Amino acid sequence: MTRNGPDDATRKGTSEVDAVEGLLAYAHSRSRWGGAALRSLTEAIALSRTLAGKSPEEHTVLLARCLRTTAGHLLKRNRAVQALPLAQEAVALTRSIGGAPLVVSLTCLASAYEALHRYSEAAATLAEADAITPPDD
């Protein structure tokens, strides 16, 4: 099924996780300058916060992804001040998880720091991300 709008993601019978995934996908298909993408991302954050509140061990990574995606969207719109707290929250959520989710969150946070001309913090954040060892396969 082709997604035509955010309503497709939140229609009756769609699981909450699928709804969040649909909202994220819809936001990626919108122009970065329009408001539809940001509204979808905001709704995805709200839904994933509810899911993470019910089952943190299962949905914290999804919430962090929504926060990172929204921060990245805001960075593309030159709104680094608004992106920074979202990126910081994503890092805080993924610290206990570690691995790839933490590395991606740290990279997003470093991008926010760079956009704000906080280069030493960006470098320290990237160094922390580089120090994380990948899991053995």
Regions found by a protein language model. Give the residues of each.
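N-terminal alpha-helical interaction modules that lie
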Residues: 1-51
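Structural register within alpha-helical repeat arrays
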Residues: 19, 24-26, 44, 51, ...
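Residue at a conserved register position within TPR or TPR-like alpha-solenoid repeats
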Residues: 28-30, 55, 67, 74, ...
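Residue signature of alpha-solenoid helical repeat architecture, marking inter-repeat boundaries
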Residues: 14-17, 54-57, 61, 100
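Amphipathic alpha-helical binding modules
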Residues: 98-134
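Amphipathic alpha-helical segments of tetratricopeptide repeats
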Residues: 45-53, 88-93, 130-134
